[in-house]
């Protein structure tokens, strides 16, 4: 996936420190399962590296994570390390290799023949930033939000097909401006 490399590095670092790790694939159901396991007391801390489920929730598409996504750990006061991985694009289910009319003016890539991935820009990316910070407003503390310096995933890294530094800057500024004071921001 578009976040696999960074996730694998993080897994190695957690293992070196003796943490037991459970990975959830951020495709909607994965995020919902993670939030449920937190509510049931089965998870004691969160490295939430993939927020594409939030973007998809905002736009009502494939990987929508549901209304509780990105809220439970903060409400419970669980330690969190957060990163907006994959939040700059959507995953839209389409007929094979078909570009939806409303997204033809966007940069895009096909993740697979039936998963269309457009880059979010302007007001679109601002909506996602606002939703992320709104979901985090109940965070009690013990949380860090990391803003990556080289893109939010494989598609948005230098040389990536969805690289858009102007949109990244807009997104990050909105995240900075809306981030609750209870969350430490790291760049």
Model-derived regions: residue spans:
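A solvent-exposed, charged loop/short amphipathic helix patch at secondary-structure junctions
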Residues: 98-116
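Metallocofactor- and cofactor-centric catalytic cores in central/energy metabolism, strongly enriched
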Residues: 2-82, 92, 105-106, 119-187
């Amino acid at each position: 996936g578009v976040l696999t490399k960074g996730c694998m590095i993080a897994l190695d670092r957690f293992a070196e420190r003796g943490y037991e790790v459970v990975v959830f694939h951020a495709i909607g159901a994965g995020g919902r399962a993670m939030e449920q396991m937190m509510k049931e007391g089965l998870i004691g801390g969160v490295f939430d590296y993939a927020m594409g489920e939030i973007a998809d929730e905002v736009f009502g598409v494939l990987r929508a994570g549901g209304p509780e996504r990105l809220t439970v750990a903060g409400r419970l006061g669980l330690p969190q390390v957060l990163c907006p991985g994959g939040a700059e694009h959507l995953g839209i289910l389409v007929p094979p290799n078909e570009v939806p009319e409303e997204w033809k003016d966007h940069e895009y890539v096909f993740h697979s023949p039936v998963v269309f991935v457009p880059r979010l820009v302007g007001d679109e990316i601002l909506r996602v930033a606002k939703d992320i910070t709104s979901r985090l407003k109940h965070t009690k503390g013990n949380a860090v939000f990391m803003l990556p310096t080289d893109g939010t995933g494989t598609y948005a890294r230098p040389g990536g097909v969805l690289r858009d530094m102007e949109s990244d800057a807009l997104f990050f500024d909105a995240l900075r401006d809306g981030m609750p004071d209870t969350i430490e921001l790291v760049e």
